[in-house]
Amino acid sequence: KIYVKRDDLMGDGSVLPPWGKLFAIRNVLLSIKPTRPLIHLSVYGSWSGWALSELCKDLGYEFIMAYPKSQKYPEQMLEKVDKCIALKPNMMSILYNKVGSIAKEKDYVRLPYAFDHNAYIETQRQRLKDVKKQLEFDHLVVSSGSGVTCLGLLLEHEPWPSLFEPENKRTFHTVCVSNEETIKKK
């Protein structure tokens, strides 16, 4: 059997998706324990800004969602977040650096790009460990953007270097939905 992790099939715009990511993001927030407002770059196609907004409300943290202003960015997503900062659309690295400048200027805490934080990666690793107790499989297929979620899952799927030994049947597959170079860096 092949099981496929598909976050893109989760969430409907009115009910938060029951992601493993949501639990991992919550763990990042709890480990940061912010005393200043949090700011995060939420890009088109991502539920992260909305999810963070809801999590921050639950945890009593102030949250600001930065986003690239464009006709494609869904208005209904913006309506769900209390405080937004529209940015001029540009390359991802430029937008992320702009959010860093805003954070420094206004004394906000900038959340790590793609939640690249040990608490997030370890939560994903533990999640797969729990799944493996219930399901037996050799192939793991994961969609990947930044590669951060993949990293936690990959670390648990099979310890290195046995993943590359010929007799090993376990295989990790990724379907790249972003830039391959960002995944290779992870």
Feature map (PLM): residue ranges:
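PLP-dependent amino-acid enzyme catalytic core
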Residues: 1-186
